[in-house]
Structure formats: structure tokens, C-alpha cells
Amino acid sequence: MLMLVFRLGDNRYAIATPAIVTVLPRVNLQSLPGSSPAVAGVFRYQGQVVPVLDLNQLLRGAASSALLSTRIVLVNQGAPDEPTRLLGLLAEQATETLESHQVEEIAERVDFCQSPYLSEMLVSQQDIIQQLQIYSLLSQQAYDELIAQAATVS
């Protein structure tokens, strides 16, 4: 399995590519007043309103930098038996991919009850990589609320 790797500060994270629809350059986002600081805003992709989460804000508590390597990773957050639910993930330094054979899963399990979107930890030749469980980033209800809010500010 192929994984997209990105860096936030000194830490590396990975998203499994089967969930990735495409990777886009950073675009201007329409803000949603009153939403969580982790919600960077919304944009239109092929006619559909897409909410965007700022992964740096979510994981480190600070907004993503406007780097040339900052990307919007467009993922399908819907489960395989659900309709497509596009979600944008603002990620810094999203410039690398790894094959699963290039990493080892750390055997010890860490309880991420406060952060259910953090999954297995992997070890590469360079360092430790934390996998993201994209299906746990945003509930269906929260997603629907963001889409409804976007409709009122459009």
C-alpha cells in the first residue's frame, strides 16, 4: 500500500492513498465564521462544496504555514458502503510517498482516546511516522453542519 507522507513541525504523518482522491495546491478558502479553529474553510471542487481541515491546527494548535509545499489532500471520508464525502486536509510539506514495505509497524499500542484519528505508528529508516485514520477526523453530523453553514455564507 502506498502512503502520502507530510510533515508538521518535526513530526511526520501518513495518509493511506486508497482514501485520497487527489492532491491540490493550496487554494483560497472561504472561512466559516464561528467554526472550530481546525476548520480552515471551504472551497468548490468540481461543483461540490468541500470543507477543509487544517491538520497543523488540529494536531499542533497552530495554523498551517503558506509554504510552496502546503497542499490540500482531497480524501473521500465516506466509508466504502456510504456516498462520497469529500474532505480537504490542509497539510504542510506533503511531498513524499512511501510503500508499506518501507516501514515497520510499532508493536506497542498507544491509546489515542483523545485523538481517535491517530492510528498506527510506523518506523521508517529516517524516523517515526504517525498514520491518520481519516474516517475519524470528522463525524457525519459535523460534516453536514459544515456543508449547511457553507450554504449560508455562499
Question: In which residue ranges do the predicted regions lie?
Answer:
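An acidic, low-aromatic, low-complexity terminal/linker signal
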Residues: 1-154
